[in-house]
Design a protein with these regions (language model features):
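Generic alpha-helical secondary-structure signal
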Residues: 9, 25, 171-172
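Short, acidic/polar
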Residues: 2-17, 64-70
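Structural motif corresponding to the early beta-alpha repeats
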Residues: 1-3, 28-29
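Active-site groove signature of glycoside hydrolases
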Residues: 14-33
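Beta/alpha (TIM)-barrel catalytic core signal, keyed to glycine-rich beta->alpha loops juxtaposed to Asp/Glu
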Residues: 30-189
Length: 189
């Protein structure tokens, strides 16, 4: 998006929300065509909005190490948002080092691995056609079996700490990276 478009879109959103600012503005799914949507122009818009007090923090979601470095060339990238759980941990090797180096926080999305870590699924659980979990490597039989075995072993902790699998998994995940933020997004209680 162009600088003008980013600023106009945020102004419209603020009006719709009835507020003067938002805490974090994330860019999502970074473009592969950096000439069409250069990070420099995006950061110029975001830094302008931050200076105006319309956003408090700048975030980018689903990024590479190169993206993070480029964002930081043009201003302060405050936080990245990435898929991260006790099953999906590529952030630790691929992005954590550069985030530590550049002072960028990490927010984890899908910490319950699309429900797999809630204890609600079995090896016999199937999903409707078109459900993204059908293609998620974590839900494939070999990995699902390993996860279910771990959850079975953790049953003793549910009673000991009087909590659910979700509570336990989120607590564990929050301790895996110093300062990690967890984004919850359950569809059902």
């Amino acid at each position: 998006l162009s600088k003008k478009s980013i600023i106009e879109d945020l102004d419209h959103s603020l009006l719709t929300l009835g507020t003067d600012y938002i805490d974090v503005l994330y860019t999502h799914w970074q473009t592969t065509d950096k000439k069409l949507y250069p990070i420099e122009e995006t950061m110029d818009a975001l830094m302008t909005l931050k200076k105006q007090g319309k956003i408090r923090a700048i975030g980018a979601s689903n990024v590479t190490e190169e993206d993070i470095r480029e964002y930081c060339q043009y201003g302060q990238l405050d936080v990245i948002q990435e898929k991260y759980s006790i099953v999906t941990r590529k952030v630790e090797k691929e992005l954590l080092p550069v985030c530590k180096e550049l002072g960028v926080s990490i927010q984890a999305y899908s910490p319950l691995e699309q429900g797999l870590l809630t204890g609600k699924f079995t090896m016999d659980t199937t999903f409707p056609n078109g459900d993204v979990r059908n293609n998620n490597p974590s839900f494939q039989p070999e990995t699902r079996k390993k996860v279910l075995d771990i959850l079975e072993d953790w049953k003793k902790y549910l009673e000991k700490y009087e909590c659910s699998y979700s509570n336990l998994v989120i607590a564990l995940t929050s301790q895996m990276i110093d300062g990690l933020h967890i984004l919850g997004g359950a569809r059902k209680p």
